[in-house]
Amino acid sequence: VVVLLLLGLTLIQSYRQYFIAWAQDAKTYEAYNEGSVAIANYLISGKHNDTKYYIVMGGYEANPIQYLTHNKLEYKLLDEKQLKDLPLDQGKILVIVPAGNNHDAQLLDLKAKFPAGTISDIRSNINGKLLFSAFESK
């Protein structure tokens, strides 16, 4: 009986530690690509037929976005050189610039190329940290 009681208490404590304390830690959201999930949700929720979508990202880090937007949305992944070479005559565009080392410089490049564009910063609901910026041309 004592062993069963100890086993039951251990299960309760493990449940609380894993599903309550650990799951609500802000670092958990960073570790599990909160930014990528937020980008995918942002793109899907604001989908417009006349807009071309771009994400300044490549390789492995884009996998969660590709998975979450599969068959829901078309976009192109860009590296920094491709971002600078974006043509001016393509209509309305939305460029997602993830937070990171070159975030500010990439936004400056976009603003210089498309001066009428607007920037929206998207922050984490958990810790308020910048996740990405959405640049929209007019």
Name what the model sees in each region:
Residues 81-138:
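Aromatic/acidic, Gly/Pro-rich catalytic loop(s) in extracytoplasmic/lumenal soluble domains
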Residues 2-51, 55-78, 125-129:
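Membrane-proximal, lumen/periplasm-facing interface regions of secretory-pathway glyco-
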